[in-house]
Amino acid sequence: MEFTKMHALGNDYIVINEFDGEKVKEEEKAEFSRKICRRGFSVGADGVIFIQKPTSDEYDVRFRIFNSDGSEAEMCGNGIRCFSKYVYERIMKKNPLKVETKGGLRVSEMEIEGDEVKKIKVYMGVPKFKLKDIPMVVDGYKEDDEFLNGELKLKNPYLPKVKLSVVNVGNPHAVIFVEDNNIDLDFVREHLDVIGKEIEHHEAFPERINVHFVKVLNPNEIRIVTWERGAGYTTACGTGTTASVIMAHKLGKTNNRVLAHLDGGDLEIEIKDDGVYMIGDAVMVYDAKLINIGW
């Protein structure tokens, strides 16, 4: 089976083209993704992207993504940029591209040089803040309430409680501003495996959640450290960056256009009246043929 390895800001994916036919059986996709993403034993990646025909005529193409633990995600910002580049360069010269995702419609606009996609601007939709959209269950809050810089108790020895905000941008995110928690990003990096994992699996989040630690540098710049649901630490997260900027702006910490610095590089996020836009690139690394999935 042929596949393509791609990355966006160091977030790496195995891309499988199923536009003209299924290559991995539906019931096997989760286990296949878990095995092939295992670094050192198989190809290794943060996730697997499947390109498929859309389920209705309102879309051009369908995006599906499975995390390295085999769980299927609703959306992925870095993944959809890789996806959009692949689709334009190898399947259809459609620009803008209307993409069907589990999180709803996403529209990719591409900056083209020759036949190559250099930059992708993705319409990320309108954020949802109600607890029922996360979902989140916490005492004292109703399902239509928002959770903005609210406090959760933790059980780890490093951070007994945390102030965080939640938002859904196609998938759910918890955004933690380090300055509001009297910690810094060095502390976060030292204890990320413990704190990030606990928040991801916290009982308040029955479907788990992505976790982002944010330092506001100035009204136009932030720095982010990410713990992704189903993947753990990653060098970048497009939807998480979008969520972080949305929350920073909503809480009055930044302007509506922000440059976000991540371990894998930079992303630009712009908040407009009709929704949120993410701007960044993607890289096609190599094509290969899978001989053995590994174990």
From Swiss-Prot:
Broad class of enzyme this protein falls into: isomerase
EC number, UniProt record: 5.1.1.7
Protein's UniProt keywords contain Transmembrane helix: no
GO cellular component: cytosol
Active-site residues (renumbered): 76, 237
UniProt record similarity statement: Belongs to the diaminopimelate epimerase family.
SUPFAM superfamilies: Diaminopimelate epimerase-like (SSF54506)
Gene3D superfamilies in alphabetical order: Diaminopimelate Epimerase, Chain A, domain 1
Name of a matching Pfam family: DAP_epimerase
Disulfide partners: none
Alphabetical GO biological process terms: lysine biosynthetic process via diaminopimelate
PROSITE patterns linked: DAP_EPIMERASE
Organism listed in the record: Methanocaldococcus jannaschii (strain ATCC 43067 / DSM 2661 / JAL-1 / JCM 10045 / NBRC 100440)
Residue positions binding substrate: 11, 67, 77-78, 171, 210, 228-229, 238-239
Highest taxon listed in the record's lineage: Archaea
Coiled coil segments of this chain: none
Protein name: Diaminopimelate epimerase
